[in-house]
């Protein structure tokens, strides 16, 4: 928003950084084929319409450019992830019963199969690689409870009191699973890397 943009410009006024305000669906402030690398950190799953985002990304990439993104992975591949998810959502849905009925973004982005097909439709002359990985976070139960909650948008709709109660339950879960005072939270992720092949005309 305007206030965030103003603050960013003020804080980096003496640097070479340049800030532009826009949406991922429309970045006309940038010229065609003007970026070597475009990185999207966990935002692609929230974007709708996502096809316009991908079209814009393709327009901005140079011939051998790279588009990389971190996207939610398969929850069944990460031990303990669903347990943490269920603790958080139990608290949220006790206050907001309909929360989670509708997911944000395009559902095709939420599975590796749907994502592969979606990317192939836009990035015709690119190599597309989707790699499932898990990220492990290790800390004392109290610290890990707060860190893990921060990865779930649902936790931010709770009041301070309800949020604190949720953290208490998360801490209890991590205490029960700790080893030598340290617990682990595992998050499933799909790593998307799209590379331009170059060396010829692209299909548009």
Regions picked out by a protein language model, each given a short descriptive name:
Residues 104-204:
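Conserved Class I S-adenosyl-L-methionine
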Residues 9-12, 88, 119, 174:
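Conserved hydrophobic residues forming the short capping helix/wall of the S-adenosyl-L-methionine
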Residues 17, 35-36:
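Local beta-strand N-terminus motif with an aromatic residue
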Residues 1-29, 52:
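Class I SAM-dependent methyltransferase SAM/SAH-binding core
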Residues 51, 58, 64-137:
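Conserved catalytic/acceptor-binding region of the Class I
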Residues 36-51, 73:
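A short SAM/SAH-binding and catalytic strip from SAM-dependent methyltransferases
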Residues 20, 39, 68:
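Conserved Rossmann-like nucleotide-binding pocket used by diverse enzymes
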Residues 13, 48, 62, 120, ...:
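Short conserved AdoMet
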């Amino acid at each position: 928003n305007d206030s965030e943009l103003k603050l960013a410009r003020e804080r980096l006024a003496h640097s070479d950084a340049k800030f532009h305000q826009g949406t991922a669906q429309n970045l006309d402030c940038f010229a065609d084929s003007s970026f070597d690398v475009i990185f999207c950190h966990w935002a692609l799953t929230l974007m709708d319409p996502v096809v316009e985002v991908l079209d814009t990304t393709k327009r901005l990439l140079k011939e051998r450019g790279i588009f990389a993104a971190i996207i939610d992975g398969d929850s069944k591949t990460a031990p303990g992830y669903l347990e943490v998810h269920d603790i958080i959502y139990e608290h949220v849905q006790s206050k907001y019963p309909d929360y989670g009925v509708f997911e944000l973004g395009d559902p095709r982005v939420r599975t590796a199969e749907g994502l592969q097909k979606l990317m192939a439709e836009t990035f015709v002359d690119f190599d597309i690689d989707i790699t499932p990985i898990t990220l492990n976070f290790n800390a004392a139960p109290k610290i890990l409870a707060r860190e893990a909650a921060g990865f779930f948008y649902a936790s931010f709709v709770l009041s301070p009191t309800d949020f604190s109660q949720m953290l208490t339950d998360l801490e209890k879960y991590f205490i029960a699973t700790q080893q030598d005072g340290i617990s682990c939270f595992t998050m499933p992720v799909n790593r998307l890397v799209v590379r331009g092949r170059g060396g010829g005309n692209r299909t548009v």
